[in-house]
């Protein structure tokens, strides 16, 4: 157990990761040494940043807390603190059930931890934080909360209403990260296309991304978590025209059946969805779309699911994730719908949908063989350097494997790579001399 060392454990999404990075920087400004390795904790203090989005995430967060409680009981830890979404939503219950935790903090008051440790809240300068990602890329959270209130989603119950950061504040953060050596920026929020509406009633995502792309040193910008309803079409022109805005868009469609879209309270129709996809592909040739779909939502019929399968087969998304419905306490669907799709049916539908997508993904990736792409190197792993094209977001998308026997490459540097082969998950390539 190392004195003045704090182990930070982050559960859940990249938005949580940004919060962890910010508080790590605050701790370091106050003389602490911070680590971000849950597998090898050694500090006298641990801070667990929890996720409370779905049941599986809650269970993972609780199990992690219990692991650290055992460390504390065994004398391997002096203080244990919990923050994040789970404690934001269930603080009272957690305090009653887990008295071994020294204190619980919510999603927005975690900086109080500094005061409780007798330390000062040091204002972050231009978003400077302790990056836990490879030094060449960072996540930039441009807003918190969500105003959409989809029937299945607990996010508004946890994070509250949509709250955009001012444009200049975000741009200052990006400039600060560029000064730290960051080249690639993953732009994240719960509903990216709503950005700015809460400030003055207008969409500002297009302005933000356009101005961000003009900052010297910004090599790649990638957009995550758009929403199809009221999608600002002028954003597509920025993606098409700015060479450092990746031709990549993460936009969750969730379903295609009008019956399901209505019950999910998505405020978009099947035809509007199909029209939007066609317009995206028309305006941005070569764009890679990542989407998320939900199966087994209450009331989903065999006909609804058949419609969803046809949609996946015809839309041919480059990237797709899918989940089966789990009832979340307090949501509209939990209050008004019976969870009437059996679990085995949910799983069968999920497996069938992903099998369709797997075939599409393999076919689309195979078409890249023989073509040359700009690739950033993330790391060296065994006999390969591992990199990504502009069409691949970290952690979730296919990677490019380049033999380390070929030549010495530098992590964080861009190379032109000719794709020589592909398999179920990844691409293989050689650096173009």
Language model regions located:
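Proteins enriched for Cys/Gly/acidic motifs involved in redox and nucleic-acid/cofactor modification
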Residues: 1-195, 234, 249, 271-279, ...
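Conserved SAM/AdoMet-binding glycine-rich loop
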Residues: 78-84, 89, 94, 179-305, ...
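Short acidic/polar active-site loop segments enriched in Thr and Asp
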Residues: 102, 183, 219, 318, ...
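Short strand-connecting beta-turns/loops that link adjacent beta-strands
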Residues: 147, 244, 256, 380-382, ...
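Conserved, mostly hydrophobic/aromatic
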Residues: 170, 187, 223, 251, ...
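Active-site proximal loops enriched in glycine and acidic residues that flank catalytic Cys/His/Asp
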Residues: 189, 225, 253-255, 291-295, ...
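Terminal RNA-binding accessory module
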Residues: 333-433
């Amino acid at each position: 157990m190392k004195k003045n060392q704090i182990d930070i454990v982050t559960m859940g999404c990249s938005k949580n990761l940004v919060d962890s990075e910010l508080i790590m920087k605050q701790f370091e400004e106050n003389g602490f040494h911070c680590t971000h390795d849950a597998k090898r904790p050694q500090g006298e203090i641990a801070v667990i940043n929890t996720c409370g989005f779905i049941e599986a995430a809650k269970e993972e967060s609780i199990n992690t807390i219990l692991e650290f409680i055992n460390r504390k009981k065994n004398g391997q830890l002096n203080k244990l603190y919990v923050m994040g979404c789970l404690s934001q939503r269930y603080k009272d219950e957690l305090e009653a059930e887990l008295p071994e935790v020294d204190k619980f903090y919510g999603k927005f008051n975690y900086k109080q931890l500094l005061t409780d440790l007798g330390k000062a809240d040091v204002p972050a300068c231009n978003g400077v934080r302790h990056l836990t990602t490879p030094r060449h890329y960072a996540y930039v959270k441009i807003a918190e909360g969500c105003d959409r209130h989809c029937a299945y989603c607990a996010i508004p119950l946890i994070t509250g209403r949509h709250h955009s950061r001012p444009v200049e504040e975000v741009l200052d953060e990006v400039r600060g990260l560029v000064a730290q050596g960051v080249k690639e920026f993953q732009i994240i929020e719960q509903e990216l296309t709503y950005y700015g509406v809460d400030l003055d009633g207008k969409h500002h995502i297009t302005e933000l991304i356009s101005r961000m792309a003009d900052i010297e040193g910004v090599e790649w910008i990638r957009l995550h978590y758009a929403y199809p309803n009221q999608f600002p079409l002028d954003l597509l022109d920025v993606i098409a025209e700015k060479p450092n805005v990746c031709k990549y868009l993460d936009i969750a469609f969730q379903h295609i059946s009008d019956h399901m879209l209505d019950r999910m309270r998505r405020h978009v129709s099947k035809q509007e969805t199909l029209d939007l996809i066609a317009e995206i592909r028309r305006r941005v040739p070569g764009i890679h779309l990542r989407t998320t779909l939900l199966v087994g939502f209450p009331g989903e019929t065999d006909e609804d699911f058949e419609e969803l399968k046809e949609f996946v087969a015809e839309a041919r998304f480059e990237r797709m994730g899918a989940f089966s419905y789990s009832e979340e306490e307090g949501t509209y669907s939990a209050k008004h719908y019976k969870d009437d799709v059996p679990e085995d049916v949910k799983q069968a539908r999920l497996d069938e949908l992903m099998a369709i997508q797997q075939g599409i993904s393999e076919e689309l990736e195979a078409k890249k063989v023989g073509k040359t792409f700009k690739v950033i190197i993330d790391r060296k792993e065994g006999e390969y350097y591992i990199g990504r094209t502009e069409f691949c977001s970290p952690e979730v998308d296919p990677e490019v494997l380049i033999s380390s026997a070929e030549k010495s490459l530098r992590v964080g540097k861009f190379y032109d790579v000719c794709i020589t082969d592909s398999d179920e998950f990844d691409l293989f390539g050689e650096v173009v001399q």
